[in-house]
Amino acid sequence: MRNGEYSRSHGRSVRTVHPFLLGVSVYQYPVCRTTVNGSYAQSFAALLFFPQIAVAFSATAPAPSFDSFLSARQRHPPASSFLASPAAPTHPLFATARTTAAQLLSTPPAPARPRPRPDHVIPKEKWRLAVADFTFHGIPKIFQRYVRPARELLFIELKKLPLRHFLSEAEQRERAALPHEEAYHARLKERAHLQRARDFVSLHPVSDHARRLRTAAFEKQIKEKEQEIERARVEVRTARARFFRPWLQAEVLVLGAQNEPHALPERFHLATHLRQKKLSALVTGKLVDVAGYVRISLYLSTGLEAEPTREFTLAGPYRELPRLMHTLSAQLRSAIENAQPVRIVFDVHPPHARLSFQGVPVEDLSKPLISYPGRYVVDVSAAGYFSATKEIYIENRPAFSLRVRLVARPQHRVRVQLTDNSAAPIFSGARSVGVTPFSTVVTDLREIFTVGPAGARSFAFIERGTFPNSQPSTLVLPAPNPNATQDLAYKRDVAYWSFGALCIAVPIALILGSTLADTHQALERAKAASAQPPPPPAPAGTGALERKSQHLLIGTGVAVGVAVILSINFIVHAARYLNAVMHNAPQAVRPRADKDIQTLTHRDEAEEDQEEDS
């Protein structure tokens, strides 16, 4: 049947289409485009049933033309309605395929799954970490119970929060080439053994022919081994030349148990040992006693040239070991996460403040400090300001600004004088404040003032919150009493001498008592031996023992009596000394406004006038 002819098939007229025109019509028909209804399934169904493009027209229907295809494309009829049209083929295979395609087309597309955030994605790569046992050097026995749980504390700190390690390109390259390098070095060792065996052939007591045969055999093996070495070298270069991501995120797994440290052999190669144990890094520690303080050093080792061993050191008292381990673990976590050094810039007010960073004083606050992310303790203090101590967290970023603003203490100008208006030096600790009467500026700080010279002193302190608001005030301190000071010194000396005499008398009484007990036991044994039948001859010295026992009894009684008397004497003098100390304790004084002082002065003068008149 030629193109353009009609035929009678299935009781209707069918207009055949040339294959070339069929391909054009498949492209032009909108059902075959991938943009129809936004589904690839519809396009596949339309392409699957491309014979349906040769639509069976009725006898009166005109032949399809390009204009009809263009109008059909403008209408965009759905593919499901086309498949369900009566003009579709009636073959059973096409009917089954038509039903399946209709089901595919009727199924709505699945909603797009939201992409998870990178922070919530669990990395596929694993970076395994182990903690070995710590070593102790020079730790006294009294402090060993403090340092024993150091490794357990570090293990707990590392297990608290999840860790992510970023594998750099250099680290990935070295880890990929590590097994090939091990094979390369193994081949080198095997070649060295073969060369050594070849050299020792000349020492064997064999014939020259056998020696040449053995040497040739070893030479052949050495050449084969050199070929293997060259292949291993090529494999190492190939592994290092591979493409790696600039940064690959890996999840850190802390292996082992709290009470089970990672066991290390006596001699080992770190990179090979870690690869055999399927580990990525190893943490070791060392604790050293330094003049009563403990110095803790942690080492993070990977065995790779791209990742050198990093050391973290901190020192402090033994009782602060948990705090030290907490700080070191924070620094270790930052190193595990491949944190870059942080440049810390200080912005401290007042400028003359003293700042210590993790217990280490910072000499120049105008210069930046280089540190690593983690938790640190900062202490700031300045004269005339409230001190501040705070734990800060430095994030993983290039620069960190530490801004500190100390709160100034309230300053008050007061006039200092004594109750009897006499002149006496005033000391605050070892610092001389002035000689009364004088004016000075004091802060709302509870400090003890010493009034008077060394021979006659009194003590006082200012109660907090007692300064008049924005008013000039006068601080009246108690005048020194020479008699009270001398009496206090005398009672102190007497109490010290009483205690010294008691310390001498008590050991003497104890020694005499023990000697008396030994003498009584010896005398009893001698009497028991003399009372046994038949009576043996009386041992010599029994009378001497009795006289010695009597003398010791008298001496012990006297010593015990003296010790009791001295004990009572010490108790009495200690009580008198404590009573004098209580009377000479620092007195609380309150600053008074100048108008109150003037009123009191006028009142005292009026009372004196009344007394004179009377």
From Swiss-Prot:
Q: Does the keyword tRNA processing apply?
A: no
Its transmembrane ranges are: 494-516, 552-574
Q: Give positions of region: Disordered.
A: 588-614
The cellular location(s) given in this protein's UniProt record come to: Cell membrane
Q: Quick one: a GO cellular component term?
A: plasma membrane
Q: What is the topology of this protein in the membrane according to its UniProt annotation?
A: Multi-pass membrane protein
- Composition skew (Basic and acidic residues), residue ranges: 591-605
Keywords, alphabetical: Cell membrane, Membrane, Transmembrane, Transmembrane helix
What name has this protein been given in UniProt? Uncharacterized protein TP_0577
Query: Which source organism?
Result: Treponema pallidum (strain Nichols)
Q: Species lineage, top-down?
A: Bacteria, Pseudomonadati, Spirochaetota, Spirochaetia, Spirochaetales
